Amino acid sequence: MEIVISAIIGLLIGGTVVFVIKRLQDNNKKKSARFEAERIVNKANSEAAKIKKESENKAKDFESRARKNVEQDIHKQKSTLKNKESQLERRLKEVEDQFKQKMEENERYLNSLKDREEKIAISENRIKDLEKKGEAHIGELKQKLESVAAMSQDEARRQLLTALEDEAKQEAAKKIAQIEEEANKESEKKAKRILATALSRFASEYTSERTVSVLALPNDEMKGKIIGREGRNIRTLEAHCGVDLIVDDTPEAVVISGFDPVRRELARRTIEKLMEDGRVHPARIEEVAEKQRNELMKSMKEEGERHVMELGIPNMHPELVKIIGGLKYRSYQGQNALNQSLEVATIAGLLAAELGVSVKLARRAGLLHNIGKAIDHTVEGSYAFVGAEAAKKYNESEDVCHAIRAHDEEEKPHSILAWIVHAAYTLSSSRPGARRPQMDTFIHRLEDLESIGNSFDGVLKTLALQAGKDIRVLVESSRVTDDQAVMLSRDIARKIEREMPQAGQVKVTVVRETRSVEHAR
């Protein structure tokens, strides 16, 4: 029994202990759960604070960027408004200037009207005075008639009419002289105004002429190629291009000398093409020179077409266009012929606009006035008449042809178009820096030397080199023998002495070359 009681008591104690332990465990779990919950809550609060802080930072960053964008937009709008304001101010100033100009013109017009009114008033007063004088004179005549009653009625009438006629003639002569004087003053004033208006709307460059061109070479090796063995290449270039090539100690450069700009341009293009190709020998030089000559002719035509289009001149013959392009390489008294033609055409157009004449026709005549200078100098006659004949040949009107002939007073101008072109030519030629007469004299001297050489039979080409101190005459080997070449050089020298005694010492070199070509098949 005691065992049972002990067992029961033990069970009770054990159950109590188990209960107490279980209770303690439950309390611990609750406590740990509470701690865990608090930890989770604290963590959530921390993350929430972190997210809040990040959101605030992002919001601040977004606000900063937005403010910056707004400020930039405001700055751009301010700049745009400022530009528009400047434009409006400029436009307002232009309008004010125009208004001021119009007001000045109106004032001048009103002043002229006042002057006319004053003149009219003076004329009316003069007429009244004349009427009074006439009435008084008539009264005197009546008294005379009364005093000479012995006169017949017809005689008295004749005397009265004669006296009135003489007085009227005197008054008319005075009035005519006054009108002529006023007309001359007014026409001179208007002419000066027209010329001043035309010149103020056009300005051109100062003219300077040169007879040499410096061509840069890539290296001195190319200089040696241009010279060639024993100078064969350089002699071939000079013969086919008609210039004098000067190769000195200047590094990587060769000087092209010649009075004809067309020949200098041909030589420059030929040498540049040979440098690109790298093959330099006489046969290649001859081939390239011929090709570049054709391309140069093509470029001259394109140059003429461009200027004709710029001036708005319609329906011009292609040959005339080509001749106009050729003026680019011609000069007269140091003035480039094409630039001078464009200058005359522009001034003629401005004068025509002021005078109410066809602007296009005036520009056409002004542009064509110089074409005689681009035609081969072997054609006889002055350049004005040669140019007029060429214009007539290519279907230009008689008014244009007459303006070409009369622009330099070789023919008396008898049309308004001819006078306009003559005035434009005079203005272009007489402005400061337009011409250099000594250059033109020098070029004519070289052309005369070449013409003398070309006048002999068997001569292919004559080239004036070294400023006219050396001329080279290329002859046909089939027509001129070696002995004849010696005599030919002597004959040319004698003719130069006779016809150009002022030329000084001139070296005449006759070049006779025999070339044999055969093709292997």
From Swiss-Prot:
Q: What is this protein called?
A: Ribonuclease Y 1
Protein family: Belongs to the RNase Y family.
Q: Where is the HD domain?
A: 337-430
What does this chain do? Endoribonuclease that initiates mRNA decay.
Show where the KH domain sits: 211-271
Keywords in UniProt for this one? Cell membrane, Endonuclease, Hydrolase, Membrane, Nuclease, RNA-binding, Transmembrane, Transmembrane helix
Q: Give Gene Ontology CC terms.
A: plasma membrane
Where is the stretch described as Disordered?
Answer: 51-87
Q: Which InterPro entries match?
A: HD_domain (IPR006674), HDIG_dom (IPR006675), KH_dom (IPR004087), KH_dom_type_1 (IPR004088), KH_dom_type_1_sf (IPR036612), Ribonuclease_Y (IPR017705), RNase_Y_N (IPR022711)
One GO BP annotation is: mRNA catabolic process
Q: How does it sit in the membrane?
A: Single-pass membrane protein
UniProt-listed Enzyme Commission number(s): 3.1.-.-
